[in-house]
């Protein structure tokens, strides 16, 4: 048995628990951000916020289903948003289930118009630092992922 195999055996349960914890934390963060009114949904809306006030953005979620993987325009937008977030020290994750995300944050805005959930930004509600335990857990998760060169980790949302 090699060292890699031994390490692989130890990290599988740990990484599964870590992933589940991150998914639960993301679920809590999305609900909290939505209640406080500091959630921006949509690729174009998010790009506007990132352009105008990137220092106020604390977290970014990119979401795409399997059928979205073939959408070249969406993938280009994702690449640009990822680069911008990395450049501005904004934690970023990917979610592979847009339907589950829609169940958490809803599918329409105040007027009932459908919302693009491919990109979600979470901003500070005011100048004071927003202390949310779920945000802190996710920041730690992202930091740990970056330490193993996983710059945009995938998170599975809980059922």
UniProtKB/Swiss-Prot annotation:
Segments traversing the membrane: none
Stored SUPFAM superfamilies: L30e-like
GO biological process: apoptotic process; cell differentiation; regulation of cell cycle
Entry GO terms, CC: cytoplasm; nucleus
Start and end residues of each stretch annotated as Homodimerization: 43-86
Keyword Amino-acid biosynthesis listed: no
InterPro entries, alphabetized: GADD45, Ribosomal_eL30-like_sf, Ribosomal_eL8/eL30/eS12/Gad45
Keywords for this protein: Apoptosis, Developmental protein, Differentiation
Pfam families assigned: Ribosomal_L7Ae (PF01248)
Keyword tRNA processing applies: no
Domain notes: Two central helices mediate homodimerization through parallel packing.
Family affiliation: Belongs to the GADD45 family.
Protein function: Involved in the regulation of growth and apoptosis. Mediates activation of stress-responsive MTK1/MEKK4 MAPKKK.
Subunit note: Undergoes concentration-dependent homodimerization, which is required for growth inhibititory activity and enhances interaction with PCNA. Interacts with GADD45GIP1. Interacts with PCNA.
Record protein name field: Growth arrest and DNA damage-inducible protein GADD45 gamma
Organism the protein comes from: Bos taurus
Lineage: Eukaryota, Metazoa, Chordata, Craniata, Vertebrata
Encoding gene per record: GADD45G
């Amino acid at each position: 048995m090699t060292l890699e195999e031994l390490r692989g055996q130890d990290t599988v349960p740990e990484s599964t628990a870590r992933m589940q914890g991150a998914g639960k934390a993301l679920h809590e963060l999305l609900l909290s951000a939505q209640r406080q009114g500091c959630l921006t949904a949509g690729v174009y809306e998010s790009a506007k916020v990132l352009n105008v006030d990137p220092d106020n953005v604390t977290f970014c979620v990119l979401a795409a289903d399997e059928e979205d993987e073939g959408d070249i325009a969406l993938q280009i937008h994702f690449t640009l948003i990822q680069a911008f977030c990395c450049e501005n020290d904004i934690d970023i994750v990917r979610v592979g289930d847009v339907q589950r995300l829609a169940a958490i944050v809803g599918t329409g805005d105040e007027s009932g118009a459908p919302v693009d959930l491919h990109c979600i930004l979470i901003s500070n509600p005011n100048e004071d630092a927003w202390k949310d335990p779920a945000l802190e857990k996710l920041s730690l998760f992202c930091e740990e992922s970056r330490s193993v060169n996983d710059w945009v980790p995938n998170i599975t949302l809980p059922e």
